[in-house]
């Protein structure tokens, strides 16, 4: 069979989006890994599936798979691409779209300037929610990594994040520390690792080593987690422009019990078909 797909990106964080409403396919872990291979497949950071909702109050079900084939809870850049895809493919004409994810419901809104605003929900810091092995919630935790002690924030944006503050993100040891923290035993389900440089109270720079994908050009939930941690520590103040290698996201978190709002672009690159056995 031939499977139709769309290649998209949000600030360089790239996705393959597949409509499983108007077509059918069985995509197991090995098949997803093959599709993710940039040499013999299509290549992507994450695969996004558009499915009918199980909850009648929702418009769609939004599923996310990393390049290693594992399903994950949430992806902010992917959410923006999801909204662009369902509008461009006339699966909905709504500007405000409700989707169900493993992490719970998300609200996506297509703004007048065609940027996408995503209600990312309330950041959560309780260790059992992240999950992270710690006796209690705290603004910062000490983490032993490769003989060094790092001051980190542990944040859930529906998926787990560790945030480290660095003086210069360009010189941050992302390639060395990223995989060590991603698989650290204190994060039993693995973790996305953000390296945060505070530029001013309303501006930051960020690099993210994503769980199951490695360093990417942008990570929406990573930007949310970094801003939430930065505001909690008193380093940042809402709203914050976060500069990632692929571009800039605008984040607003006005109060601890408020949803964190993320606004940024979503771009279609090309459409194609691939043969599946």
Swiss-Prot record:
Keywords: Amino-acid biosynthesis, Cytoplasm, Isomerase, Lysine biosynthesis
Membrane-traversing stretches: none
Signal peptide: none
GO cellular component, one term: cytosol
Swiss-Prot/TrEMBL site (Important for dimerization) positions: 270
Disulfide bonds: none
GO molecular function annotation: diaminopimelate epimerase activity
Biological processes annotated in GO: lysine biosynthetic process via diaminopimelate
Subcellular location: Cytoplasm
Binding of substrate, residues: 13, 46, 66, 76-77, 159, 192, 210-211, 220-221
Residues annotated as catalytic: 75, 219
Pathway in which the depicted protein is active: Amino-acid biosynthesis; L-lysine biosynthesis via DAP pathway; DL-2,6-diaminopimelate from LL-2,6-diaminopimelate: step 1/1
Broad class of where this protein is predominantly found: cytoplasm
This protein's record includes keyword Isomerase: yes
Site (Could be important to modulate the pK values of the two catalytic cysteine residues): 161, 210
Entry superkingdom: Bacteria
Reaction(s) this enzyme catalyzes, per UniProt: (2S,6S)-2,6-diaminopimelate = meso-2,6-diaminopimelate
PROSITE patterns on file: DAP_EPIMERASE
HAMAP family: DAP_epimerase (MF_00197)
Subunit and interaction comment: Homodimer.
Family, per entry: Belongs to the diaminopimelate epimerase family.
Function (record text): Catalyzes the stereoinversion of LL-2,6-diaminopimelate (L,L-DAP) to meso-diaminopimelate (meso-DAP), a precursor of L-lysine and an essential component of the bacterial peptidoglycan.
Protein name: Diaminopimelate epimerase
Organism: Chromohalobacter salexigens (strain ATCC BAA-138 / DSM 3043 / CIP 106854 / NCIMB 13768 / 1H11)
Chain's gene name: dapF
């Amino acid at each position: 069979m031939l499977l139709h797909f769309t290649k998209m990106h949000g600030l360089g964080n790239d996705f393959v989006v597949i409509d499983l409403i108007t077509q059918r396919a069985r995509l197991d872990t090995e098949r997803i890994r093959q599709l993710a291979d940039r040499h013999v497949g299509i290549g992507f950071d994450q695969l996004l599936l558009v499915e009918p909702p199980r909850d009648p109050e929702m418009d769609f079900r939004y599923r996310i798979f990393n390049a290693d084939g594992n399903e994950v809870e949430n992806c902010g850049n992917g959410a923006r691409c999801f909204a662009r895809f369902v509008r461009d493919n006339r699966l909905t004409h709504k500007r405000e779209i409700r989707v169900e994810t493993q992490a719970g419901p998300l609200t996506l809104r297509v703004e007048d300037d065609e940027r996408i605003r995503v209600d990312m929900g309330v950041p959560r810091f309780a260790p059992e929610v992240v999950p992270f092995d710690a006796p209690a919630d705290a603004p910062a935790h000490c983490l032993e990594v490769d003989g060094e002690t790092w001051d980190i924030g542990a944040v859930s944006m529906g998926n787990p994040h560790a945030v480290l503050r660095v003086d210069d993100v360009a010189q941050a040891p992302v390639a060395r520390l990223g995989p060590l923290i991603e698989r650290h035993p204190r994060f039993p389900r693995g973790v996305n690792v953000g390296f945060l440089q505070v530029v001013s109270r309303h501006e930051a720079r960020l690099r993210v080593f994503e769980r199951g994908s490695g360093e990417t050009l942008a990570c929406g939930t990573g930007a949310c987690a970094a801003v939430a941690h930065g505001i909690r520590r008193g380093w940042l103040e809402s709203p914050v422009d976060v500069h990632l290698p692929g571009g800039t996201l605008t984040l607003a978190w006005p109060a601890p019990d408020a949803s964190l709002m993320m606004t940024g672009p979503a771009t279609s690159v090309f459409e194609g078909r691939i043969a599946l056995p």
